UniProtKB/Swiss-Prot annotation:
Top-rank lineage group of the source organism: Bacteria
Native organism taxonomy: Bacteria, Pseudomonadati, Thermodesulfobacteriota, Desulfovibrionia, Desulfovibrionales
Native source species: Lawsonia intracellularis (strain PHE/MN1-00)
Pfam families in UniProt: ClpS
GO biological process: protein catabolic process; proteolysis
Primary role: Involved in the modulation of the specificity of the ClpAP-mediated ATP-dependent protein degradation.
Family: Belongs to the ClpS family.
The protein, known as: ATP-dependent Clp protease adapter protein ClpS
Length: 109
């Protein structure tokens, strides 16, 4: 029997390259809060604390950024988690009678 010269690692590339090809970081998305003239600052802070797990200080800082700039980043997450947070925010805002708007934006790599 002769020894085969076929080596799948050599044919396909180095182990490091194979690992890099198999394990890719998921795309990340910013969850953006948009300012409006009706949603209270207190409600925005409560959403940031409950849904986005921010401290009171972090939530207040983000809320003030949204208020002053018209938009602010609530957090950066994988797509599925970001979509869940957006949907939960919209549901709670509707239940409370607020038009708070929340959107996703893909993070550039």
């Amino acid at each position: 029997m002769t020894q085969s010269s076929y080596n799948p690692i050599e044919q396909e590339g180095s182990p490091e390259l194979l690992l890099q090809e198999k394990i890719r970081r998921p795309k990340m998305y910013q969850v953006l809060l948009h300012n409006d003239n009706y949603t209270t600052m207190e409600f925005v802070v409560s959403i940031l604390m409950k849904i986005f797990r921010k401290t009171m200080e972090q939530a207040t800082s983000i809320m003030l950024s949204v208020h002053r700039k018209g938009i602010g980043v609530a957090g950066v997450y994988t797509r599925e988690l970001a979509e869940t947070k957006v949907n939960t925010t919209h549901m709670l805002a509707r239940e409370a009678g607020f038009p708070l708007r929340c959107t996703l934006q893909e993070v550039d790599e």
